[in-house]
Every structure is written in structure tokens, then in C-alpha cells.
């Protein structure tokens, strides 16, 4: 297993960690023409309850 030769400074550690960013979720429009709400891809629409043209669950 690799072991660091020297202690990494606080500035270098923080500079390296500053690159770890959370990306914003990708949103798509609901395929239901009456709804068109933004939703996550490959997930049933939370407002109308449809997925791939089928009614999966009751609308919220």
C-alpha cells in the first residue's frame, strides 16, 4: 500500500478537495403533453405519475 512521504499541508489538502463538486441533477420534461413538468430521467413523473406513456402511480 502506498504511504505518503511527507505530511500534506492544509493549503494543498484544501486545494485538492476544492475540485470535489456536486453536480446539479439533469432534468428533462415529462413526456405527458398535459404535464410537461421537469423530472429526473428514467424516473416516473412525481406530478402526474406517468412513466414511458403508462400510468405508474396516482398523481401527488
Swiss-Prot record:
Keyword vocabulary terms for this entry: Ribonucleoprotein, Ribosomal protein
Q: Where does it sit, as one GO cellular component term?
A: large ribosomal subunit
Keyword ATP-binding included in the entry's annotation: no
The keyword Ribosomal protein is assigned to this record: yes
Q: Which Pfam families match?
A: Ribosomal_L32p
InterPro entries the UniProt entry points to: Ribosomal_bL32, Ribosomal_bL32_bact, Ribosomal_zn-bd
> Which SUPFAM superfamilies does the UniProt entry name for this protein?
Zn-binding ribosomal proteins (SSF57829)
Renumbered residue ranges of the record's region Disordered: 1-20
Molecular function per GO: structural constituent of ribosome
**BP terms from Gene Ontology:** translation
What segments bear the compositional bias annotation Basic residues?
Answer: 1-19
User: Into which family does the record put it?
Assistant: Belongs to the bacterial ribosomal protein bL32 family.
Q: Which HAMAP family match?
A: Ribosomal_bL32
Q: In its UniProt entry, what is this protein called?
A: Large ribosomal subunit protein bL32B
The species this protein was found in = Saccharopolyspora erythraea (strain ATCC 11635 / DSM 40517 / JCM 4748 / NBRC 13426 / NCIMB 8594 / NRRL 2338)
- What taxonomic lineage is listed for the species of origin? Bacteria, Bacillati, Actinomycetota, Actinomycetes, Pseudonocardiales
Amino acid at each position: 500500500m502506498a504511504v505518503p512521504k511527507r505530511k500534506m499541508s492544509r493549503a494543498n489538502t484544501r486545494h485538492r478537495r476544492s475540485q470535489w463538486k456536486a453536480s446539479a441533477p439533469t432534468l428533462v420534461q415529462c413526456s405527458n403533453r398535459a404535464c410537461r413538468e421537469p423530472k429526473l430521467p428514467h424516473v416516473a413523473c412525481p406530478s402526474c405519475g406517468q412513466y414511458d406513456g403508462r400510468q405508474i402511480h396516482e398523481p401527488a
